[in-house]
Amino acid sequence: MVNKSTTNGVSDPNLENKRTKVTLTNSGVENARGTYYSGAYTSVGYDNSFNLNRFKENFKINILSESANELVFEMIGIDAPIANALRRIMISEIPTMAIEKVYIINNTSILQDEVLAHRLGMIPIKVDPRKFNFKLPNKEYTAEDTLIFQLKVKCEKDSVTGKIINETALSKHLIWVPTQDQEEMFPNEEDRPRPMEDDIPIMKLRPGQVIDIQCYCEKNIGREHIKWSPVCTASYRLQPVISVDKSIKGDKANQLLEKCPKKVFDIEDSGQVVAARPLDCTMCRECIRDPEFEQNVKIERVRDHFIFSIESTGALKSREIFQEAIKIFIEKCNIVEESINKLVN
């Protein structure tokens, strides 16, 4: 973690900036690599070791925006390896339910069976995966580990109006078929298994064409196949810090405002240019392409300040995805701790 010096009261601004910031210049990125060795700065009086109490004081999570399927929040006081571990867990290690087996009874459409099966597998299923078990290999399907959906669509032409009926097979045509006591598992209508969206196109049909399919959903994780990933995107970026020299005023200030495609800068009443909307900055560096501005505008990112964006497929809420990722991360830490204890003992 990015720690303050504990061995003296004097801080070297250049060294502190190197430890805590990533700098972007016209020619590239400087100081991108973090230094985590505890004794890296001992010779100049900095204690770079991890301190649990200091971590507890500095660590923060601030929610910037939240809806059922989208979550944007700040995580302050952690290093990139931890942030990236959480991101990877959200993408590939949180289980969901997805169509795994497809039994094609009839398919007279022009789409090949294997392509149709693949399309069905990529439709996100709205159901809480925590209510189901992982299916064991070579075992029969049970209500505890499998969901069954029926897809039966026939395209016809109305003899009176000439209108084509069921011209497009949609995800809403996937009908859940309860087995054993599954209806008791979902007493509320809104909780019952269904495709996340009703209007996902599966395929086009012409009059007389029929598809009759049984789909079996199983629980698994995104590391096995991306169809089991609970997120559309899970990403993070570092907090931007943009500073502008006070000498930029008048016409130069207006030129700087015009250079930024995201309109990050504003001019205050005093004539001073400020970065009013730093979170909108995409680090395109257009503002420092001109040598005239390169020396007067400084673009940095805070090394331990992450802005996470999570977009759910709908199987789980974005908040639940992050909570599950934390649980899995703790389990992994416990495994490492147990392994180390075995080696030591």
UniProtKB/Swiss-Prot annotation:
UniProt keyword annotation of Transcription present: yes
SMART domains: RPOLD
Keywords, sorted A to Z: DNA-directed RNA polymerase, Nucleus, Transcription
Gene3D superfamilies from the UniProt entry: DNA-directed RNA polymerase, insert domain, RNA polymerase, RBP11-like subunit
GO CC field: RNA polymerase I complex; RNA polymerase III complex
GO molecular function: DNA binding; DNA-directed RNA polymerase activity; protein dimerization activity
Keyword Cytoplasm: no
Compartments where located: Nucleus
SUPFAM superfamilies reported for this sequence: Insert subdomain of RNA polymerase alpha subunit, RBP11-like subunits of RNA polymerase
PROSITE patterns (alphabetical): RNA_POL_D_30KD
Region (Disordered): 1-20
Function of the protein: DNA-dependent RNA polymerase catalyzes the transcription of DNA into RNA using the four ribonucleoside triphosphates as substrates. Common component of RNA polymerases I and III which synthesize ribosomal RNA precursors and small RNAs, such as 5S rRNA and tRNAs, respectively. RPAC1 is part of the Pol core element with the central large cleft and probably a clamp element that moves to open and close the cleft.
PANTHER family: DNA-DIRECTED RNA POLYMERASE, DNA-DIRECTED RNA POLYMERASES I AND III SUBUNIT RPAC1
HAMAP family registered for this protein in UniProt: RNApol_arch_Rpo3
Family indicated by similarity: Belongs to the archaeal Rpo3/eukaryotic RPB3 RNA polymerase subunit family.
The protein's assembly and partners: Component of the RNA polymerase I (Pol I) and RNA polymerase III (Pol III) complexes consisting of at least 13 and 17 subunits, respectively. Interacts with RPAC19/RPAC2.
Name of this protein: DNA-directed RNA polymerases I and III subunit rpac1
Organism: Dictyostelium discoideum
Phylogenetic classification of the source organism: Eukaryota, Amoebozoa, Evosea, Eumycetozoa, Dictyostelia
